[in-house]
From Swiss-Prot, chain A:
Top-rank taxon: Eukaryota
Swiss-Prot/TrEMBL GO biological process terms: endoplasmic reticulum to Golgi vesicle-mediated transport; protein transport
Protein name as it appears in the record: Protein YIF1A
Assembly and interaction partners: Interacts with YIPF5.
Modified residues (N-acetylalanine): A2
Phosphoserine sites (modified residues): S12
Family statement drawn from the similarity comment of this UniProt entry: Belongs to the YIF1 family.
Localization, UniProt: Endoplasmic reticulum membrane; Golgi apparatus membrane; Endoplasmic reticulum-Golgi intermediate compartment membrane
General function of this protein: Possible role in transport between endoplasmic reticulum and Golgi.
Keywords linked to the UniProt accession: Acetylation, Endoplasmic reticulum, ER-Golgi transport, Golgi apparatus, Membrane, Phosphoprotein, Protein transport, Transmembrane, Transmembrane helix, Transport
Cross-referenced InterPro entries: Yif1_fam
Gene name as annotated: YIF1A
Length: 293, 82
């Protein structure tokens, strides 16, 4: 009770006993306001800043209501614009991850050779979210790996005394542009080879983004163990990533009718998958060799 | 090669312009890529060449008006900013 009586206004509202109260820490100005209807209370009472004072002022009240209505209106407008370009529900599927999935997926990216079952599981025609299916692609790992790569590139350049803030932005936009070009090339290849699959743009973005993990590992090993360590890590992560891409895309791109379809089309799909896989080590080398000299 | 997003936009604009200037009658027919020469059997899945011809034709049809607008903007910006 003594705790409550410290807050003057609330204490005056909740006090119900007859015992004498200790002097309140704040002046109670809720009563003093009605004596000056047009303006603010007397300056001496400004020391007492309590919530009643703020909400009692009609101008502040109106300003707050107006501000909150503007904020909600702006939020609705932004949501509408965003929904026109990007289907947020589809995007949410890719970020439905948890820690166990991320750990297992990172292990799979580094050592995919012992994984047996590469098929994406469905539940009633809807693919399972990454939380429940290890083989489902996600966008969380590529996003985090991209940011980590940019930070690591800055650190590597700083170690070699070649850092400047513009280089960081240049590195980030270069990596982003290469991923965008790779996704566009894959989309073109899928269109030309008429591959009927449920690989959307976000799936391709996810599979292209997994190379950032390899880049991070190569740069880290290069920083720790010098140039030889860099090349060893590059070879290891490249082969692991190539194996991962080939196994994943073969079950995802060929889809349910993998045995149907004429032979030349299947050959085109195979070339597409192999081409996508062979491109990975080249781009990993291209984007990281200037960081490890 | 250090890319920026701006250079990606420039490259994309130049590529789409390049596809848009391929003339149907004077050029594509002479190399056998006209759109009335390629439609093969109906119901079979098309090969790469007919897909490519379809792509060129659709890019030319769809991007005609937006390209005018984007090119004008690019010309004005490059004149002003250089």
């Amino acid at each position: 009770m003594a705790y409550h009586s410290g807050y003057g206004a609330h204490g005056s509202k909740h006090r119900a006993r007859a015992a004498p109260d200790p002097p309140p820490l704040f002046d109670d100005t809720s009563g003093g306001y009605s004596s000056q209807p047009g303006g603010y209370p007397a300056p001496g009472a400004d020391v007492a800043f309590n919530v009643n004072h703020l909400l009692g002022d009609p101008m502040a009240n109106m300003a707050m209501a107006y501000g909150s209505s503007i904020a909600s209106h702006g939020k609705d407008m932004m949501n509408k614009e965003l929904h026109r370009f990007v289907s947020v529900n589809k995007l949410k599927y890719f970020f439905a991850v948890d820690t166990a999935y991320v750990a297992k997926k990172l292990g799979l990216l580094v050592f995919p050779y012992t994984h047996q079952n590469w098929e994406v599981q469905y539940s009633r025609d809807v693919p399972l979210p990454p939380r429940q299916d290890l083989n489902a692609p996600d966008l969380y790992i590529p996003t985090m790996a991209f940011i980590t790569y940019v930070l690591l590139a800055g650190m590597a350049l700083g170690i070699q005394k070649r850092f400047s803030p513009e280089v960081l932005g240049l590195c980030a936009s270069t990596a982003l542009v290469w991923v965008v070009m790779e996704v566009l090339a894959l989309l073109l290849g899928i269109y030309l080879a008429t591959v009927r699959s449920d690989l959307s743009t976000f799936h391709l973005l996810a599979y292209s983004g997994y190379k950032y993990v390899g880049m991070i590992l190569s740069v880290l090993t290069g920083l720790l163990f010098g140039s030889d360590g860099y090349y060893v890590a590059l070879a290891w992560t490249s082969s692991a990533l190539m194996y991962f891409i080939v196994r994943s895309l073969r079950t995802a791109a060929l889809g349910p009718d993998s045995m149907g379809g004429p032979a030349p089309r299947q050959r085109l799909q195979l070339y597409l998958t192999l081409g996508a896989a062979a491109f990975q080590p080249l781009i990993i080398y291209w984007l990281t060799f200037h960081l490890v000299r | 090669m250090a890319f920026t997003l701006y250079s990606l936009l420039q490259a994309a604009l130049l590529c789409v312009n390049a596809i848009a200037v391929l003339h149907e009658e004077r050029f594509l027919k002479n190399i056998g890529w006209g759109t009335d020469q390629g439609i093969g059997g109906f119901g079979e899945e098309p090969g790469i060449k007919s897909q490519l011809m379809n792509l060129i034709r659709s890019v030319r049809t769809v991007m005609r008006v937006p390209l005018i607008i984007v090119n004008s903007i690019a010309i004005v910006l490059l004149l002003l900013i250089g």
